[in-house]
């Protein structure tokens, strides 16, 4: 069984800033969300947790699994997509001239520029991670948890459910919510 969770809230989430690989910590609400998720999902018998090395995801996993004997294993391939020089940009949804606008509004026409990562690069690294780490565990009937980020999580969900790129954002997971894939 595979479960996926998005990290708790950060100040940049609340300010509608692109986080990407910028290492932003959870804010007080994000900490509370992760603690509440720990209670809500305490009955799920996770065997292992893979997590992005970024602080907001690591802290979410630590709070979620506090007091449980579940290994938390960071993997660089679970980092959020890089938005390059556009990280920190506010309200990209209101700026069609910004190259990152299509990332959210029209994924099939998104072109990575200025140090940003492409969808192809994102799918390549998360696909490799799935094949190398997750699929063998699922074949052994293990219960696997991934704690990550919006786009990174969606790339895994899209791959496993066969969702085309134009529908990439239909599976968005709210902060600290858990889905079963």
For every predicted segment, state its role:
Residues 9-68:
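Active-site-proximal alpha-helix that buttresses catalytic centers in soluble enzyme cores
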């Amino acid at each position: 069984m595979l479960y996926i969770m998005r990290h708790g809230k950060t100040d940049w989430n609340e300010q509608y800033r692109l986080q990407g690989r910028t290492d932003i910590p959870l804010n007080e609400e994000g900490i509370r969300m992760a603690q509440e998720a720990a209670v809500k999902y305490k009955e799920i018998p996770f065997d292992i947790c893979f997590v992005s090395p970024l602080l907001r995801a690591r802290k979410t996993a630590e709070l979620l699994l506090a007091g449980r004997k579940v290994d938390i294993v960071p993997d660089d391939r679970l980092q959020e997509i890089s938005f390059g020089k556009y990280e920190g940009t506010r309200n990209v949804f209101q700026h069609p001239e910004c190259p990152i606008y299509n990332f959210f509004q029209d994924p099939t026409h998104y072109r990575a520029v200025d140090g940003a990562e492409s969808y192809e690069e994102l799918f390549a690294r998360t696909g490799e991670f799935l094949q190398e780490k997750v699929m063998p565990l699922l074949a052994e009937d293990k219960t696997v948890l991934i704690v990550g980020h919006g786009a990174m999580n969606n790339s895994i969900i899209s791959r496993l459910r066969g969702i085309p790129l134009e529908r990439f954002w239909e599976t968005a997971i709210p902060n600290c919510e858990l889905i079963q894939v």
